């Protein structure tokens, strides 16, 4: 059975060089991130393999899950904990067959509970809803109501909130029932990533 994704879920931004990426990821993990998703949309396979391998090492050192965005082959090659798939990123059932019963497979469900139902039926182990707040990373994303987390709980789903989450609004997502909060800018654009991670992770200690 796949492990649940819970607490602070760090998602790396595009375009960072190795040193900056690894330093910020280490800070997020030290601050309390319990999972980290490697998101890199470049076509440089060598860069992606190199960065993913080091990020996985950091996650192992901190006891955190390591998830690869949109690349089942890379996740399989390095033995990542799992993969996250968006609407156009691949087939959930095929990823489950390839990665096995214990892999974490996440699915972007945007603002639609029916996508969550379909993803779970296909073999997803968690579903992500967003943007729950206005997002700089995806400014044109549809707004996902926080009521989706009660709907997801009724399905027995491991549910993740994403989109515009920062220390000042994270509590609203947690109180609505999100099992995890996926954060990009609120962590990696912060002046102090470790401190931002502690503040975000702290919402789960209070629940």
UniProtKB/Swiss-Prot annotation:
Gene Ontology CC annotations of this record: cytoplasm
UniProt GO BP: thiamine biosynthetic process; thiamine diphosphate biosynthetic process
Keywords: Magnesium, Metal-binding, Thiamine biosynthesis, Transferase
Manner of cofactor binding, per the entry note: Binds 1 Mg(2+) ion per subunit.
Enzyme class: transferase
Cofactors named for this entry: Mg(2+)
Signal peptide: none
Catalytic activity: 2-[(2R,5Z)-2-carboxy-4-methylthiazol-5(2H)-ylidene]ethyl phosphate + 4-amino-2-methyl-5-(diphosphooxymethyl)pyrimidine + 2 H(+) = thiamine phosphate + CO2 + diphosphate; 2-(2-carboxy-4-methylthiazol-5-yl)ethyl phosphate + 4-amino-2-methyl-5-(diphosphooxymethyl)pyrimidine + 2 H(+) = thiamine phosphate + CO2 + diphosphate; 4-methyl-5-(2-phosphooxyethyl)-thiazole + 4-amino-2-methyl-5-(diphosphooxymethyl)pyrimidine + H(+) = thiamine phosphate + diphosphate
Annotated S-S bridges: none
Xref: HAMAP family: TMP_synthase
PANTHER family, sorted: THIAMINE-PHOSPHATE PYROPHOSPHORYLASE, THIAMINE-PHOSPHATE SYNTHASE
NCBIfam families: thiE
Name of the protein this chain belongs to: Thiamine-phosphate synthase
Organism: Chromobacterium violaceum (strain ATCC 12472 / DSM 30191 / JCM 1249 / CCUG 213 / NBRC 12614 / NCIMB 9131 / NCTC 9757 / MK)
Taxonomic placement: Bacteria, Pseudomonadati, Pseudomonadota, Betaproteobacteria, Neisseriales
